[in-house]
Amino acid sequence: KDYGHLLKDDARYAARAERVSSLARDVSELLPDLVPALRGRLNKPAGPVAYHPPCTLQHGQKLRGGVEAHLAELGIELRLPQEAHLCCGSAGAYSVLNPGIAGTLRERKLGHLQEKSPVDGTRPARIVSANIGCITHLQAGTETPVTHWIELVDELLQK
């Protein structure tokens, strides 16, 4: 999405980059159009689902709240953790270059993601996110399955 901005002064690529930027979409931006077609076609998940909104989505692309709202519209009991706005420690190459700090951030994030519900005392059966770096980083610290939210939707879709 940033190619247009990054290459705006490049005489050869500025127009092409702007075109690519205008076409680029995160898969979550398709959800508003898909919810009506998916409503009523999903099985219920095995249990509550915790959602980790990745930095790439909420800070990089400034896309906040959409995934959560639309998954809830589809009947998925979604839990947002405390400190949802904070990084899980993956941060691209950060987890490789600074594994100690990245591990500390991961443990803090997983602690919040896996908290028991104050209502019924259950823990999430699954964690979903929207960034492969976050997904692999979080999965390395827990036995709870961690996947992309679209994988969850695909699995729940009555085929």
Regions found by a protein language model. Give the residues of each.
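Iron-sulfur cluster-binding electron-transfer modules in prokaryotic oxidoreductases
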Residues: 1-159
